[in-house]
Amino acid sequence: MNFHHGWTFHKLRKNEHFLKYSAIFYSLLKPVVALFACQCLVLIRPLARKIGSFPFLILTFHTLFYPIQNTVGAQFEVIGQSLMGTAVGVTWGIITKLFATAANRNHGDGSPILATSLALASFISAYIRSRYGYRFFCIIWIFIDCFLLTRDPFEKTIAKSFYISLVYPSLIAAGVVSLVTILVPPMRMASDLVGQSGLDHLNKIMQSLNFSVENFFPSDESVSFSSSSSVIKRMFKEHESVLRNSMDDFHTAISSSEIELNYSNVSVSTLKLLEPKFERITLAMSAQLAASFTLYETYNFSIYKNQDKEVEGDIRVSELRFSLPESTEVQQKRNIFTPQYQLHINGSLRAKVRPKDSKDRIVNLSNLYFSNVDHMSSLILGSLKLAHAIMKWLVSDVEHIPDERLRECIESLQEIDSKEENLMTEIFCTAFKETKKVNDFGGFEEIEDEEEVLVIAYYLFNLFEVAREVKNLLLLLEGLKAQRHNKPKLFFRKFNLSLFDKQKYANYAISALLTHFTAGDADKCDDEAPDDASGEEDDSPKVLNDQSFFDSVRYPLKFFLRKMRRKCWRVYHFTARSKDVRYGLKMAIGIGLLSIVAFQKSTAARYTLWNGQWSLISTLFVLEVTVSTTLRVGLFRTLGTLSGAVYAYAAWEVSQGWSYAIATLTFAISWVSCYVKYNTEYSGIATVFNITFPPILYGSYLKTSTISPFHLACIRFIVVNVGIGMAIVVNIVVFPYLARRVLKYKLGQASLLSLKQYTTLSDYLLSRNLYTNLTICEGYKKQISSLLVTARKLLQLVNMEFNLKGPFPVGIYNDLIIKLENLGIRLVVLNRVRSRFGLYLYYDVVKNMIDYRKDLIVSMTLTFYILYNSIMSKAPIPYFVPSCRQALWNLRLAIEEEGKRRFVTNGGILAQGAGSDGVAKDVPENHSWLPAQKNFFLYYVECQVIGDIVTDLEYSISLVRRINGEKENETIGKKMA
């Protein structure tokens, strides 16, 4: 029996390895076949003679400008851009060459015309590439001009090979790649890529749901707070990272299908409708994971405080949710600021010891509501599996899901949604029954005793949110089922992928922070205010009282000079601030400096003999936006050039010029190079390798070079490194664009957007119309996510820069990126919670508590601004920071006092006419407070989310302080001494 089980396990592992290797084989089949087809075409000598002097450029065009893409539509988009770049580059080169040859025939010098035209083309193409994209179009344009304009700049006539030497290789490579894309399996359509990415994302959501349910309540054996909490916290971070990465993969799949060339049962534009639903489910699932970890922390904290002795040592606020102040006097102090050390060490946590039966209470409560959690999670998991099956049916030919089963699942989720209010009321009734002072509202006096109940309720609330979003997904899939065709059809369209209209919401200003004086001061300074507060000068002339002749001459001249100064300021401001202009100037200067050798009479012949165009091409592909990217790409290009040159010389010596041996060797190495290019992070090395050995190996085979392969390989390596060195020098000297600086800028912009997002939510809360816009808030979150994605990429490049200020804190920056992303997510969750506020709750916990609300809003807004200012300008963190946690507690205790005032002790009846503005008159007579606990529970959920935001804010500020090099604050004892 053991042998049988062992054999079965070995067979399963063997099948897994076979499936893995077969998937890699099929993924490499297309690029290898395309590369081998281009190699065979180059080896045909009659065809090579007709192509011109550079037949090996077929391989260069294929590798650089026609790479195999994931989908057919993306492949034809690349081919279209490259062909357009070929047309523009050849046209630009021909026109420039006509002017240069005309100057040479008329006893002039046409080389300055060629040099100027090449620099101008470099600037325009680099600017378009940096600002608008179209990467393949821009690169192939300047690539062709680098070859055409540096060949014999002093000739007086244009040879016929000038027109076709680069056009034929481009067309041949495009044709080969097009045929391979269509004919060689597997042929992936856009719907296949998007559908598979969506199915993978649903699998990740189901895994996260299983994890949160399995860890809904830990076992009794896990009594260690530090070890078990750290392990569980790491697991939660891993699941959050997996969810984020799978959602990013789905976004990438949608983006790669911008031009849809699709032959399937459903269009990509139909599948794109799933994107907002997936985002909301991911958001709800992230909140559910956070609630699960909160529940786990509460359980461990109840064990941690279940002891007779007070706990000594530092307690991190980030490990806990709320803590009571030491006394009622401290509670009622509405201090806006608190010292820095209270962000980390909170002595009030030792003020009260947890009740000894807290562990038993939370065990009993979890057992009481575990059946609800088990039923809901099972239904949600079954619904996600059903959504997975329906989506799989949309993109492939599998068994159809009956509509009755889908409707039954939707009705079950709807029934669960309708039971939310009753279950929340039951939970709070349980909390009040556990207290000894129900009638005088004493349950809120011992809020620590009820923390377990509230945390379990918070967990259930987020589970209800997940169920609601899954129900919306099923409703959408029910509508999308009608969009599926019984037979595959051809879809071809281009749809807009803009996620957020930046201009629409660009006018949202933070007047409370940007205004440095009050309204009264503004009235006093009205007459002394400048003409234009934005920094630009006014074009309109002043009304003059003096009408003399000198004034009539002087003031128009002054106005004209002021206007010209303003235009010059705008040009300078645009040049200095625009990343696109800076990149274009760097590209033009780099290529212009290297092309000087090609346009000098004394060095032009040697330049062509040395194959010096490759130094220009190296500058083209190495000179990136940031210095660190230039160093990284330059290193990859050096390694790729070295390996390609060594391989070309070795292959020539082994093959001895035999075409079949050359084809065999190149076909074998194609598998290795394509694997490195498409399945590893060293794709830059493989790309340069594929364009390095053809000029050396095939040049010797076709007798296009008069020098030996060894010398050609050495010269190629030297000129490429000359281009790399020039690119590095230009990028450092001309507008240095450092990854560290850009990284800090991106993080500062993300924190500023978080500030705008919170101020927008505060405006909604304090407005009278109870208006909450989910679109604007989620749009801010998408912008934050986009900035943080760029920050993650830059974080991988900072170590490539010249390190003059010591080691770069990569780990701290990574933690800061995670916290900023969590802030964006939790602000969206806060907006979604507030969107459920009704009129009763609004007047009860918002309008009557407006002063406490303003304290909390001011404290959090100032904290957000301190975070933004410290990141952007490296400003030191003030010793006294806004006391967000204290303001939050003051608000909670104020709500408690309001509840006491409105509660009648005889029978627990809500008083009629109580409260301000006659709000309670709208409440029905004999309406108990307990059935209305849904309102209070939404308030608790809001406070819980705000508490998480405060925790992330405090931790982010501590990270920024460490990044800025500020010293850690001393302990309380040293401060008191």
From Swiss-Prot:
Residues listed as glycosylation sites in the UniProt record: N210, N262, N265, N300, N346, N364, N496, N773, N926, N969
Membrane topology: Multi-pass membrane protein
Highest rank taxon of the organism: Eukaryota
Cellular component GO terms, alphabetical: endoplasmic reticulum; membrane
Cell location: Membrane
Main localization of the protein described in the UniProt heading: membrane
One GO BP annotation of this record: malate transport
Keyword RNA-binding: no
Segments crossing the lipid bilayer: 24-44, 54-74, 83-103, 108-128, 164-184, 376-396, 585-605, 616-636, 656-676, 682-702, 717-737, 857-877
Keyword entries, A-Z: Glycoprotein, Membrane, Transmembrane, Transmembrane helix
Designated name of the protein: Uncharacterized protein C26F1.08c
